[in-house]
């Protein structure tokens, strides 16, 4: 029998709330933390999962938790395994820009996300992509965008019709991040 995966999951009512029970059930031994109020203990975990949500609505609380953001950045730079989807990916970026200003996030990914009302654009639909000879499937739903040009993706993402879309997928050390909410995460990302 193999080792049980130990996963730390960011979770709260809105910033990191897009969690599916089947995903949680597949993640082995799970513990939760709230990035708005807690500094995570990342020692001894096998993976950090940052699900989607609305971090752009809670930037003040996330900014106040500088120790949390730094701990996650340090974990990523040491090669810690992270899966970040949509809002989780936004949290890993340099900053989130809202109508109220620019707010620093974890700084793992060198991009800025705009959540300004004038920049909103709906991105919605099923997505699939290949990475390391594995097919990933999921869905995308967000109004936020990258500030400036869309960053280069490590792979091409397609919609349900098989047409290419501009949704980037990022890899940094053991970090996998995208706007795509993935299905069967652990079956695919091993």
Question: What do the PLM-derived regions correspond to, one by one?
Answer:
Residues 1-67, 74, 113-119, 145-150, ...:
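N-terminal beta1-alpha1 cap of cysteine-dependent amidohydrolase-like domains
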Residues 1-5, 10, 113-190:
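Amide-donor transfer/coupling interface in amidating biosynthetic enzymes
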Residues 3-6, 42-44, 76-78, 84-85, ...:
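Short gly/pro-enriched beta-turn/loop segments at secondary-structure junctions
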Residues 27-29, 79, 102-105, 135, ...:
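A generic structural signal for alpha->beta connector loops
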Residues 36-38, 71-72, 92, 165-167:
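Generic recognition of flexible, low-complexity loop/linker segments
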Residues 48, 85, 106, 141, ...:
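Hydrophobic, well-ordered secondary-structure elements that form the walls
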Residues 55-128:
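Cysteine-nucleophile active-site neighborhood
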């Amino acid at each position: 029998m193999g080792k049980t995966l130990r996963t730390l999951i960011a979770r709260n009512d809105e910033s990191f709330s897009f969690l599916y029970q089947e995903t949680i059930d597949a993640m082995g031994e799970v513990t939760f933390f709230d990035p708005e109020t807690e500094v995570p203990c990342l020692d001894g975990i096998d993976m950090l999962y940052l699900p989607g949500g609305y971090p752009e609505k809670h930037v003040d609380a996330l900014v106040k938790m500088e120790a949390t953001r730094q701990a996650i950045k340090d974990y990523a730079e040491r090669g810690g395994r992270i899966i970040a989807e949509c809002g989780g990916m936004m949290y890993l970026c340099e900053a989130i820009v809202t109508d109220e200003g620019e707010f620093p996030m974890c700084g793992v990914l060198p991009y800025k996300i705009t959540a300004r009302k004038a920049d909103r654009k709906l991105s919605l639909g099923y997505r699939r992509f290949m990475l390391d000879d594995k097919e990933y499937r999921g869905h995308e739903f967000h109004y936020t965008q990258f500030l400036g040009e869309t960053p280069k993706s490590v792979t091409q993402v397609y919609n349900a019709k098989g047409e290419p879309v501009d949704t980037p997928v990022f890899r940094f050390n053991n970090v996998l991040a995208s706007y795509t909410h993935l299905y069967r995460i652990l079956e695919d990302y091993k």
